[in-house]
Amino acid sequence: MEHQIITQNVYAPDTEAKLDVARKLFAQFDSNKNGTLDPSEVAGLIKTTFENMGVKDYSVTADDVKLYMKSVDVDNNGLVSYSEYEEYVIACLKKAGFDCEVKQKVKRSAKKRDAATEMKLDVARRLFAKYDSDKSGQLEEKEVYGVITETYKQMGMDYKPTEADVKLWMSMTDTDKNGTVSIVEYEDFVISGLKKAGFMVKEFTQA
């Protein structure tokens, strides 16, 4: 089965840090986890944005929401998608003097999931890109050692994988048994781990 692969932009560390805050805010107010914000959810996002800037007890008006929707809802469907939101945040960061030049493009599955899950996957995608040394879009066994080592490191553990560890990891991740792990297989493996850990994952179709 063919899976569509797309690319995702990675920015300078300071810019990515701000985007991480924005992603968490989007995930917080995407209450039904459908990957979009409706006007009522946008009102909560605006209020929290003001609070984060030190403006307490700000009363969000209908005009505030309309103005925000006009600026962000590019396709005018009455909803703010995550991609529209991120483009708006990047434009604001650029105006504020942040470096918004794309530093790297990482491959990812075209599947769309809720923003909280996407934040987890963003970390995994960058890890995949880092150890895909020949940029083939596939991880070979020799590249998997680094992935496993850094995964443990992110959990605060200094662990060096053995050959048996790598072969076990490959057996769980390489679902088509072609000897390499694609970004789609890797994302599916990460999603499976998140679900086992009790993390709610929602996939949806969005144009």
Curated annotation (Swiss-Prot):
SMART domains: EFh. The modification Blocked amino end (Met) is found at M1. Residues 17-52, 60-95, 119-154, 161-196 form the EF-hand domain. It comes from the Eukaryota. Ca(2+) 1 binds at D30, N32, N34, T36, E41. The keyword Lyase does not apply. It comes from Tetrahymena thermophila. One of its GO terms (cellular component) is nucleus. Ca(2+) 3 binds at D132, D134, S136, Q138, E143. Expected to play a crucial role in calcium-dependent regulation of ciliary movement. Keywords: Calcium, Metal-binding, Repeat. It holds the Pfam family EF-hand_7. Ca(2+) 4 binds at D174, D176, N178, T180, E185. One of its GO terms (molecular function) is calcium ion binding. This is 23 kDa calcium-binding protein. Ca(2+) 2 binds at D73, D75, N77, E84. GO terms for biological process: regulation of cytosolic calcium ion concentration.
